[in-house]
Amino acid sequence: MYKISFAGLLRGNDKDVEALAEAATTQGFLELELDCMEAKALQKDVKFLESFAESILDSPEDVKAAYHFHKTGRFRTTGFKPLGSEEGAKAGNPDGFEFFFLPQKEILLSEFREQLNCPPLAMSNIDTLTDCFKHYERTAQMLLQRLTEGLKLGNELLNAHNTSLPCVTNMGLIRYPPQPKESGNFGHIAHTDVGSLTILAATQRGLQTLDNITQKWIWVDPSDECLFVQLGDSLKFLSRGKILPSLHRVLPSDVAPEATKYTIAYFLRPNEEAEITSDDGKVWLYKDYHCRKFDAFARPLGYRPDGEESLISLRDYTGVE
């Protein structure tokens, strides 16, 4: 697995930029070493967000229902998702996670702050959450800049992620409760992320990504010294196929199935009005393509309308028992 220095990318070191470009075109994922002062701010953010995730996901059920992510905010970027409401990583089983989403647009762009619709617990922590978003945004923009340089692209990536314009970027605070073999809930279906890149931290093992060279699933071990970065569909589209999105899934931990797992996921996504061209040649506004893929996740088990097979990638149950 590629392990790339945050400090090296920040300085624009040729070796690290080349490694990032190689990871993007061969695997679609990498580990980002937190080896400088700027990166240490992210480590601090992760610790706060893990604690906040536990608190917000312990909210009463009536609060979770009132802020369901299908009816809160815009483009599925805000609110709670209940456990077991989508298809899981095992055929016929519902998923094994719940989440709370926070939107970047309403938090970082002052002209939209009054539109933020979140539970009181989130609002009482809004200053710290704002700082977290700023640190993640700077990191994501740095990665886009280095990808542009390493792959000798034009300004496609940077123009589609203009920080002064409304975007669909958000933060996911995700909880996987214990899932022993007798549990009916089972992980998260194999898929590629609809957005541009995802910056992940986790408290327990569970994430698997497909090694594109060996075509085998590999476990991703969480580490306090690294963040895991996955590249998504939108970077593939914006780079005209140069960047490879990471196919991944979440299974119950093979070493701690009785543990509760928390994942902090920063989902960098394009601006709402950015144009992307999907694999079939159709041009979309990102906000519309985003909602189409999120709706595909929520389909009933075994149901997939024509034209959606490429959206959930794919029902690969290899190695799932």
Swiss-Prot record:
GO terms for molecular function: dioxygenase activity; metal ion binding. Keywords: Dioxygenase, Iron, Metal-binding, Oxidoreductase. Binds 1 Fe(2+) ion per subunit. InterPro entries: IPNS-like_FE2OG_OXY, IPNS-like_sf, Iron_ascorbate_oxido_reductase, Oxoglu/Fe-dep_dioxygenase_dom. Gene3D superfamilies: B-lactam Antibiotic, Isopenicillin N Synthase, Chain. Fe cation binds at residues 191, 193, 248. 2-oxoglutarate binds at residue 261. This is 2-oxoglutarate-dependent dioxygenase gloM.
